[in-house]
Each structure stands twice: as C-alpha cells, then as structure tokens.
C-alpha cells in the first residue's frame, strides 16, 4: 500500500456505495472536491466484481485529479445496509442482495493499494455536514435523511457514533405508533418512523386520501401514476399550488418526523438536527419546504424541555448528493490524522 506518513498536503478519496451507482470523489485536506467519477454498481454481478470496478474508479479519480496514488493518504468507503464496521464487512445489505458477509473494506484496500476506512452511509453523510457543511462547529449533530426510508447519522464531539454493534443511528426504526393499526415498516415491524415520514409513507397516505375521495387536485394525477414513487413529487407540486390536502400531507409528515426526533433529542441532547435527503420539498427555496421546516420546529420545540427548545438548532442540510462520498473522505482524513498523532 502507499506510504502516506510523509505527505505534506494529503489528499483523500471518498466512495459512496449505492444500490445503483458507486460515486467516487477525490478531495484535498480542506474538503474541496478535486475530481468526481461514477460507475454502475451492477449488483447482480456480485461484490467481488463491483469492488474491483470500485478500485478502478478510485484510481481513475486520482488520475483525473492530476495526482498519483502516492499523493493520497487514505480512502473512505460509505456503505448502506447492516455492517460490521470493526471487521470491514457487509452483513446483510438489503439493497445489495447476495453480498452478505463480504469483506469489502479489505478487498477495496487490496485492489486499490490504499488503506481504507469503512463507515455506514448515514454517519458518513452526517460527517460531511459536520466537516464542510451546515453542521460545522456543532458539538452534537444529528442528520436525518428522508427518501425511500429515513436514514440517520450522529456525530458527537467530532466523531461519528456507530453503536456497539455498528447499528447506531437507525432512527428510522424508532417506534412512534403503538396502536393496533400502526403502519407496517419495510423491516417487518409496525409503527416505525420510516413508515410515516419517508417518501413511501407520503405515497401511502396520499393514496388513502385519494381513495377516501377527499377533494384534491392530486386525485387524477395519483390515479394516473405509473409508480408509487412518483407521488411525493406530485404532493410537493400541488402543495406549491396551494392544494389543501397536499399541504396537509406535508404538515403531517413534518409532525411525524418531529415525533421521531423528540426521543433522539431527549436521549442524545444534540446541539443541532439537520434534515436532508431527496424529500425535503425543495428546502428553504420553496414555500412548501419552508412550511415543512417550520412545522417540524413548532411541533418539536413544543414537546421537549424548554431549555433544550431554546438552544436546539433545526435546519436543512446542504451537502445534497455529495454528502456520502465527502463524508467518507472526511472520515478517512480523521483516521489518518489520528494515526499520525499515535505515531
């Protein structure tokens, strides 16, 4: 492997492994992206093939940045699914079928010739916000990402919190509904936050409003849909146009999310919670996005201890689709720095 101990201005590579694509970014020590490369995951070919192509993308990104492997101190790899971080293995990644118990960290190190830091994609995204994003300087940061599911990453005192069994931050499976008719989560349990505050939850509730014949401009669009995952965008567009049912769904989603946040706040006492992911209804740039955040704030602050409500910052994340690879590179940088101190 490359010897990084003598690098004056080290560079780092971040890899974001997804079910569809692998994103690779080469970053300098300040967190600036020098080059960016993507390659399809091609899950069906298996983890060995994907890891070899991942390593090729890492080396391609290094060359594209005008560097050599000797200029890179370390690679960071962020992965979805159930992981065993100490051993660097995928355990049961739900969106990577057939990849169970694959030692991906060591394989990437072998194929790239560079040392590798391994992390869950949620904490990696949170670390990106802490390092160069909206969470800079925060002592306790929680990032909640809203998409098909609800992801989470926690950064405490500058370090990601992975938990004892590499499961820390699975806030999407916090219980928010104990009723007999609680919604099913895709994990097979009822009443989890993810079943209510994710894009899937929004789609399911919207369908119910349409089937109950509420008066809404969503009706024709929802009935004509090709896929359920088109519905959250419809809700956003109709909410922007002032549709009352669409706005109701947005506010419901905000309240459900806040209910999941409350237990996190009282347990962890963060200084900041950031909301990111694909389903933020346009963020601060749109009226609906502002209503969404305002509703989250109002519901949350009204239900937590007053001294926390007065101090907690709730805001949108800013790193977007770059968060995964940037955070992975940042974690690689942190590991490298700590190794230098130890020497």
Describe the function of each predicted region.
Residues 37-39, 94, 164:
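Short hydrophobic alpha-helix segments
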Residues 88-99:
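A charged helix-plus-loop insertion that forms the helical arch/lid used to bind
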Residues 1-74, 84-89, 106-114, 128-138, ...:
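ATP-binding/phosphotransfer module of carbohydrate and carboxylate kinases, centering on a glycine-rich
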Residues 40-42, 98-99, 167-170, 176:
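A short acidic/small-residue loop/turn micro-motif
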Residues 116-120:
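General beta-strand structural signal in soluble alpha/beta enzymes
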Residues 22-26, 150-155:
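Short beta-strand scaffold segments in enzyme catalytic cores
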């Amino acid at each position: 492997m490359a010897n990084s101990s003598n690098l004056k201005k080290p560079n780092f590579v971040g890899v974001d492994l997804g079910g569809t694509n692998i994103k690779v970014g080469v970053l300098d020590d300040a967190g600036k992206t020098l080059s960016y490369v993507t390659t399809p995951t091609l899950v069906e070919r298996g983890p060995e093939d994907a890891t070899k192509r991942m390593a090729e993308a890492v080396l391609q990104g290094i060359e594209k940045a005008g560097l050599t492997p000797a200029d890179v101190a370390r690679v960071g790899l962020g992965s979805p699914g159930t992981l065993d971080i100490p051993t660097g293995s995928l355990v049961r990644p739900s969106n990577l079928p057939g990849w169970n118990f694959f030692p991906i960290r060591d394989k990437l190190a072998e194929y790239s010739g560079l040392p590798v830091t391994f992390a869950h994609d949620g904490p990696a995204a949170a670390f990106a916000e802490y390092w160069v994003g909206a969470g800079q300087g925060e002592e306790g940061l929680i990032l909640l990402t809203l998409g098909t599911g609800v992801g989470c990453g926690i950064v405490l005192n500058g370090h990601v919190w992975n938990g004892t069994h590499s499961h820390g931050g699975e806030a999407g499976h916090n219980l928010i509904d104990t009723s007999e008719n609680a919604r099913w989560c895709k994990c097979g349990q009822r009443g989890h936050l993810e079943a209510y505050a994710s894009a899937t939850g929004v789609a399911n509730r919207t369908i119910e409003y349409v089937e109950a014949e509420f008066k809404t401009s969503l009706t024709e669009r929802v009935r004509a849909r090709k896929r359920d995952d088109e519905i959250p965008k419809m809700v956003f567009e109709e909410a922007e146009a002032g549709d009352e049912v669409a706005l109701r769904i947005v506010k419901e989603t905000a309240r459900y999310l806040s209910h999941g946040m409350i237990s996190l706040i009282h347990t962890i006492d963060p200084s900041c919670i950031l909301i990111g992911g694909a389903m933020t209804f346009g963020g601060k740039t749109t009226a609906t996005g502002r209503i969404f955040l305002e509703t989250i704030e109002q519901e949350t602050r009204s239900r937590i201890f007053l001294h926390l409500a007065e101090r907690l910052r709730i805001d949108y994340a800013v790193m977007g689709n770059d968060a995964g690879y940037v955070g992975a590179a940042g974690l690689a940088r942190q590991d490298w720095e700590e190794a230098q101190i130890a020497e």
